[in-house]
């Protein structure tokens, strides 16, 4: 994918129409990721904010570590389907202008969303929001690999690169395909880490995950025939079953983390 990456000028809701699929089928993050976040933050933990919170998969996990967590998300559909817990709230907001006082935030997280932002503006807003020694932690998971069935992996790659491909993936997807190397927060104290996120899912869950892709939503919006029933049949054959819940697909997601601290 070699399309130039534009600077977003207005919010284009790519996930509102698929917010339920996003909540139900997107991977949740493992304990290793939150342990890294925990280790990167200092002892002052009054307020964490999760920007581009989506349906709150990461937002609610931060509640264990901080007195209060606010998820900021520009899609009303995502907020309506967001995970709830006592010390978490959600607010409708773009990433580039957050209605909080300067120096009031201990941690800013961005999970699987920074590639949609106007990054130079977001970096400056992050600096404004964070207190001294506050942390900005950004991460994204890349294209998963199916590890227990080569035929299924071929189907998976064909769906990503050919059926959806450049014509339906937004240009911003290139940030993820390039392992977030072009996400460069303007903080001097910045490190990078890549971890693995292994998962097992049923064939039905895999089809649900495909339905949560923004590229799939664009594919359907363009008037194309839904290919997911055909992909399901191909996966059933690959795993030699007729039951979409009887066999597990083992997958691994690479997770690219960027850890910054305001000095």
Swiss-Prot record:
GO aspect biological process, one term: methylation
Domain of life: Eukaryota
Induction: Up-regulated by Pseudomonas aeruginosa, PAO1 strain and PA14 strain infection. Up-regulated in gcsA null cells devoid of glutathione.
Keywords in alphabetical order: Methyltransferase, S-adenosyl-L-methionine, Transferase
Alphabetized GO MF terms: S-adenosylmethionine-dependent methyltransferase activity
PANTHER family the record matches: METHYLTRANSF_11 DOMAIN-CONTAINING PROTEIN, METHYLTRANSFERASE TYPE 11 DOMAIN-CONTAINING PROTEIN
Record protein name field: Putative methyltransferase DDB_G0268948
